[in-house]
Amino acid sequence: MSSVCDVCGKGPGFGMSVSHSHRRTRRRWNPNIQTVRAMVGRTPRRLNVCTSCLKAGKVTRG
């Protein structure tokens, strides 16, 4: 499943996991993407939307 929001374009953030001994390994933080049926124009479509867009009301479900 895609880890990019279809509404705002938010994607994963990249960085390092740092242990107590300060060994570092690459990791990524994915946004909380949900598949919802949303109205695009007059037709319902399945979109991958992040939860911050859902909470802000940027998507009309249908």
UniProtKB/Swiss-Prot annotation:
It holds the Pfam family Ribosomal_L28. It comes from the Bacteria. GO terms for cellular component: ribonucleoprotein complex; ribosome. InterPro entries: Bacterial_rp_bL28, Ribosomal_bL28, Ribosomal_bL28/bL31-like_sf, Ribosomal_bL28_bact-type, Ribosomal_bL28_sf. One of its GO terms (molecular function) is structural constituent of ribosome. GO terms for biological process: translation. Keywords: Ribonucleoprotein, Ribosomal protein. Gene3D superfamilies: Ribosomal protein L28/L24 (2.30.170.40). Coiled coil: none annotated. Belongs to the bacterial ribosomal protein bL28 family. This is Large ribosomal subunit protein bL28. It comes from Parafrankia sp. (strain EAN1pec).
